[in-house]
């Protein structure tokens, strides 16, 4: 029950600040805090040096990551990981 309450509070915070997140301005990805309300953040899309997309899934667990537009950074890292780097 406590965990549910915390999730609700975090969701409200995500709604309050998601509109002002840096996702849209972040060249590494487009994380949207508002979408964290629905239990997952927007997938971060990063491009590694080889020009391939890496899709970050970290927003699923951490709404604040997407709120601040960090989803794409995780995606970039995943892109390297997917290539074996």
Swiss-Prot record:
Region listing for Disordered, in residue ranges: 22-85
Domain of life according to the entry: Eukaryota
Keyword rRNA processing (UniProt): no
The entry's keywords: Antimicrobial, Fungicide, Repeat, Signal
Keyword Repeat among UniProt keywords: yes
Tissue expression remark: Hemolymph.
Signal peptide range: 1-18
Feature: compositional bias, Basic and acidic residues: 63-85
Compositional bias of kind Gly residues: 22-32
Post-translational modification as stated in the protein's UniProt record: The N-terminus is blocked.
Sequence segments annotated as region (2 X 7 AA repeats of Q-H-G-H-G-G-Q): 19-73
One GO BP annotation of this record: killing of cells of another organism
Sequence repeats: 19-25, 67-73
Protein's job: This protein inhibits the growth of a variety of fungal species. The antifungal activity of this protein is enhanced by the presence of sarcotoxin IA.
Subunit structure: Homodimer.
The protein, known as: Antifungal protein
Record organism: Sarcophaga peregrina
Taxonomic lineage of the native organism: Eukaryota, Metazoa, Ecdysozoa, Arthropoda, Hexapoda
């Amino acid at each position: 029950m406590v965990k549910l309450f915390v999730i609700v509070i975090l969701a409200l915070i995500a709604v309050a600040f998601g509109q002002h997140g840096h996702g849209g301005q972040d060249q590494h990805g487009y994380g949207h805090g508002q979408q964290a309300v629905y239990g997952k953040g927007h997938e971060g899309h990063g491009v590694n040096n080889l020009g391939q997309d890496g899709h970050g899934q970290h927003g699923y667990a951490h709404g604040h990551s997407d709120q601040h537009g960090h989803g794409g950074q995780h995606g970039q890292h995943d892109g390297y990981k997917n290539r074996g780097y």
